[in-house]
C-alpha cells in the first residue's frame, strides 16, 4: 500500500526520484500512464488488475474501446535506477501539466504524481467530501 505526500522535483532529463518508502515495491518496475489529471505509477500486479477490469468493462459496453486503447498506448514501463529515479515521458508530463515541482502521493495500490496547484485543488474537494462522508456515517469513519 502506498500512503503519504512528498514534495519532489523532476530533473532536466524528465526523471523523478521516488520517495524511499515507495521504492521497494517498485524495484522490479512499474507502469506509468496518465490517470485523472495526474501521472499514475502502478506496480505490475495492479496494472494487470486494471487491464482485466478494463477488458471486462469494454466487453460489457461500459467503457469505450478507444478510450482503453489510448490508456494503454500512452503507458510506459519503467524500472527505477540505482538512485530510485524513474523516467516520466514528455507526452505524459505535458498531458497533465507537470513542470519541475511535483507532489508525489500514495493512493492505495498506486502512486500519483501531481502538479502542486492541481493537487491542492483536489485535496480541498476531497477533504470536504471525506468530512461529509464521516458525518453521514459512511466511508473511513464507519466502524
Regions found by a protein language model. Give the residues of each.
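Flexible "stalk/tail and boundary" regions
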Residues: 1-8, 12, 22-78, 82-83, ...
